[in-house]
Regions:
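Short, electropositive alpha-helical surface patch
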Residues: 105, 109-124
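A glycine-rich helix N-cap at a beta->alpha junction
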Residues: 119-135
């Protein structure tokens, strides 16, 4: 085989905002729990989209997160999303002389977007068409209760697609 392999990706690239020690049995989270499958509420181990969740709760995501977390900031921020994470892993294990890994996408011109852009630039992935635009950075709020299920732990996920909608 001659020539360089080029792997290009577009899709889910976001920040994961991890909140540790969220008590899934607390009064703060109870109003936001799912009552039946697919209703837009929170369910252990499952992801819900921001639009569905806000409709279910009748409140903005920022207000809901503040209520659930007691207004505290997330404990950890990471690069997330299956598209970019798999591309980063591929770029880390391949020879850059033989394989070029590229990503195309969007994030917001907010602090999370600046974090994401800065973090992505430290990876071996080539940001071919990655721009910060006037929209919210795609994010997943990860609520973690390590005591849930008799100490086995579990997470609940709320995804905001934000600027990713604007990639054309």
């Amino acid at each position: 085989m001659s020539g360089k392999i080029i792997v290009s990706g577009v899709g889910c690239c976001l920040v994961d905002l991890l909140y540790n020690n969220i008590d899934f049995g607390s009064n703060a989270i109870l109003p936001f729990l799912s009552k039946k499958r697919g209703d837009g509420g929170l369910t252990p181990g499952k992801l819900v989209f921001q639009d569905e969740f806000e409709k279910y709760c009748g409140e903005s995501l920022d207000l809901i997160i503040s209520k659930i977390t007691g207004g505290r900031k997330y404990d950890k921020i990471n690069i997330g999303g299956p598209s970019i994470v798999s591309l980063i892993h591929l770029a880390q294990v391949t020879d850059p002389e033989k394989c070029e890994v590229r990503f195309y996408g969007r994030a917001g011109k907010d602090e999370k977007g600046k974090y994401l852009f800065s973090s992505l630039r430290k990876t071996p992935v080539i940001l071919k068409d990655f721009k910060l635009i006037d929209n919210r950075t795609p994010s997943t709020f990860v609520l973690s209760d390590p005591s849930f299920n008799r100490g086995h732990g579990e997470r609940k996920f709320i995804n905001s697609i934000g600027a990713a909608w604007d990639y054309k």
